[in-house]
Amino acid sequence: MKKTAKHFCPHCQKEVSWQDNPHRPFCSERCKMIDLGSWFSENYKIPGEKKPSEDEDDN
């Protein structure tokens, strides 16, 4: 018998079927979109040095 690992939705922590799941690693389209919204609203950030924006003058 093949042993399968348990996977959990990063947003709601429900157990997720990995195989044949079009939303993986999420459990649903809803959780996937909530996560995407968090990236867009900058709730999630990747650590590193801040680059100057194009609006800032280099003079």
Curated annotation (Swiss-Prot):
The record's annotation in InterPro entries points to: DNA_gyrase_inhibitor_YacG (IPR005584), Znf_NHR/GATA (IPR013088)
**Might you name a Gene Ontology BP term for this protein?**
regulation of DNA-templated transcription
Gene3D superfamilies per the UniProt record, alphabetical: Erythroid Transcription Factor GATA-1, subunit A (3.30.50.10)
GO MF terms on file?
Answer: zinc ion binding
Q: Which cofactor does it need?
A: Zn(2+)
* Pfam families in UniProt: YacG (PF03884)
Q: Could you tell me what the cofactor note in this record states? A: Binds 1 zinc ion.
Q: Does the keyword Repeat apply?
A: no
Positions that bind Zn(2+): 9, 12, 27, 31
Q: Which UniProt keywords apply?
A: Metal-binding, Zinc
Q: Which family does it belong to?
A: Belongs to the DNA gyrase inhibitor YacG family.
* Role noted for this protein: Inhibits all the catalytic activities of DNA gyrase by preventing its interaction with DNA. Acts by binding directly to the C-terminal domain of GyrB, which probably disrupts DNA binding by the gyrase.
Known partners and oligomeric status = Interacts with GyrB.
Provide the protein name: DNA gyrase inhibitor YacG
Q: Which organism is it from?
A: Geotalea daltonii (strain DSM 22248 / JCM 15807 / FRC-32)
Q: What is the lineage of its organism?
A: Bacteria, Pseudomonadati, Thermodesulfobacteriota, Desulfuromonadia, Geobacterales
